[in-house]
């Protein structure tokens, strides 16, 4: 029997190409509590109407393709298709629109950030009808949130593990980031922890290079942790970077860290990938390890205002995939971060319920139900003069991380750590006494300098250092 080559009109299938908006633009649609909602910033090519552009995004990120196909008739597109349900122009921008798309929950595998992103931010970002496309925000329904473990432990459990309350945690990234031997690296870790820091950190690109193999680093850092704990009576930690070329090697490093009895490991979640990150987060919960997350590569994805993925989406994805800390920008340091927008996604990381607030870039109300919170990490170009602002901006549930601002102290690493700890304790005490950190911050630091020569020396070195550039990440 030869295959059928002709189609009769009565079959109901009409081959060819039709406008996306005929199927995927549905302004009358009422969103469901179970829908994943997305806000895209869409820049259509000249001559492409916004309705067609928004519908194309909905189609290409869900069930659509460039032409009608026979197999459309074998399923229910009304049940599974994405829908562009609202479009609004972007104020102050020509030919840019916020297009809202609703996705049925059945399109996504449970507990998989990888699958969710493969659909929503997949091939559609290379679509020719669009000049540029940026995912500004996602609303994750509670039905989907509950399919994720999320952070291995969360903020309160971490505080209980560390026995540290009522203040931000203090950290330091060991510098130079590359080139130190394992023994010298461990020495720097010890000096910083002995001086008063809670944590030290592997830089994100420290994995297992010829000058310092991972096992040697882990051993010397563990020795530094135990020695500093014995001398200070405080629980200490070092973010041992378990990121590796394969998931198997990553897990081997995490297992060795657990065997050493250290409290925390680290992962570069964007370069390492969401599948690897989620696997590591599950291991960390099962084995009592905290998980510090670095966002290396994020600016490639999120820095351009009209194309890519906003970091608030990457932050939500991390909370779902799993991490106890994540770098979030500083507002005041050397790296990108506008205050209101930064605090918007900081709240998305920490709080259980966040109301829609467009002034802070939050497009949807988000309910995290029982998913634990994540500590934001302020890191990058910060020093003791920034301490009042950081304490006021980020509050107690944060990690303030000074790399060069510790190791660059003129008297050495331990005095650098002392200076940061004294500055933090002074700011917390002043705040608790009702003083205004934003207005009196410099005075508070100067007062503390009178009884801390280490802090006075740090203040003298960095008194003129500022990073005053306009933020790219604006509303």
From Swiss-Prot:
Binds 1 Mg(2+) ion per subunit. Its cofactor is Mg(2+). Mg(2+) binds at residues 201, 203-204. Its main location: plastid. The active site is at residues 175, 294. The modification N-acetylproline is found at residue 3. The keyword Magnesium applies. It catalyses: 2 (2R)-3-phosphoglycerate + 2 H(+) = D-ribulose 1,5-bisphosphate + CO2 + H2O; D-ribulose 1,5-bisphosphate + O2 = 2-phosphoglycolate + (2R)-3-phosphoglycerate + 2 H(+). Its EC number is 4.1.1.39. Residues 1-2 form a propeptide. The record marks 334 as: Transition state stabilizer. The modification N6-carboxylysine is found at residue 201. It is found in: Plastid, Chloroplast. One of its GO terms (cellular component) is chloroplast. The basic functional RuBisCO is composed of a large chain homodimer in a 'head-to-tail' conformation. In form I RuBisCO this homodimer is arranged in a barrel-like tetramer with the small subunits forming a tetrameric 'cap' on each end of the 'barrel'. Belongs to the RuBisCO large chain family. Type I subfamily. Heterohexadecamer of 8 large chains and 8 small chains; disulfide-linked. The disulfide link is formed within the large subunit homodimers. This is Ribulose bisphosphate carboxylase large chain.
